[in-house]
């Protein structure tokens, strides 16, 4: 094959890729898990619902773009984004330095604090810790809380969803050698917690309060709320890192468009309103 033909073939291949990725025109495909209530879940009919689903439609309206919500298992979320199964992630994904090595994020649109959950009557109830600690700040209160947790969780089994910031924290050793049991979904974590297969579970606090309210189970939040450090700096829209080619430029524009839309949604009170509807409080950033 001549150099000229190779060049033409390369150009056509690039155009074909762009065509495949953006054939839907103005449509933005947004990936979500559909299994992390109240952030995102499904109703009895299988329809995707939740805070982020409703917010996604709001942001698309501000961008004057059509939207499509794509369901994706959590542990394959970032790989699917990189493979261009969809254009953005809205799935309760916290903005962390580790994830920013692979993808980029919009500005945060919601706060998410993590907390341990146990069944009522557990020996872990009543731990003497601060109400909340920020691992990015550190200090004596943080060190004291981690020491208390290390002692309380020694020999205990803590259940957690796989490939999450919560698993990363437990695996870090900050709370000692905990027996970590991982699950594919948060629903599986909740079920094993209430069935007694876990001494405790770690996730976003609202994931447990939502489950307890809907199931009637006696789930109790214990210990401090966690933020910062391994837990990140709020939840944002995950987008591919922009390259220098035409596709990369489209990703860069999409990031800018999401940031502008989040600004508008925040200013007009949309994020606060939707958060209060789904969380029962204003989690907007």
Name these PLM-found stretches.
Residues 34, 111-115, 213-259, 261-285:
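Periplasmic-binding protein-like
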Residues 18-23:
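Sec/Tat signal peptide C-region and signal peptidase I cleavage site
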Residues 24-93, 101, 268:
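Extracytoplasmic small-molecule ligand-binding "clamshell" domains
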């Amino acid at each position: 094959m001549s150099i000229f033909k190779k060049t033409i073939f390369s150009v056509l291949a690039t155009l074909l890729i762009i065509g495949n990725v953006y054939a839907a025109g103005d449509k933005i495909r947004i990936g979500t898990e559909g299994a992390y209530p109240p952030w995102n879940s499904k109703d009895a009919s299988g329809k995707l619902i939740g805070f982020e689903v409703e917010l996604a439609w709001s942001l698309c309206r501000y961008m004057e773009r059509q939207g499509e919500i794509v369901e994706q298992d959590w542990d394959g979320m970032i790989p699917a984004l990189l493979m261009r199964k969809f254009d953005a992630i809205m799935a309760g994904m916290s903005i962390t330095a580790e994830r920013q090595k692979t993808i980029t994020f919009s500005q945060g649109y919601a706060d998410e604090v993590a907390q341990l959950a146990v069944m009522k009557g557990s020996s872990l109830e009543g731990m003497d810790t601060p109400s909340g600690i920020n691992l990015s700040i550190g200090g004596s209160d943080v060190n004291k809380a981690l020491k208390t947790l290390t002692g309380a969780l020694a020999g205990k089994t803590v259940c957690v969803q796989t490939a999450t910031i919560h698993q990363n924290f437990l695996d870090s050793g900050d709370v000692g050698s905990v027996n970590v049991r991982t699950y594919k979904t948060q629903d599986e974590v909740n079920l094993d917690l209430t069935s007694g297969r876990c001494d405790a579970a770690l996730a976003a606090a609202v994931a447990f309060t939502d489950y307890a309210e809907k199931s009637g189970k006696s789930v109790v939040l214990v210990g401090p709320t966690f933020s910062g450090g391994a837990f990140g700096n709020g939840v944002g829209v995950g987008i591919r890192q922009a390259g220098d080619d035409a596709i990369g430029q489209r990703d860069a524009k999409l990031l800018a468009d999401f940031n502008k839309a989040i600004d508008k949604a925040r200013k007009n009170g949309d994020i606060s309103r939707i958060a209060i509807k789904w969380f029962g409080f204003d989690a907007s950033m």
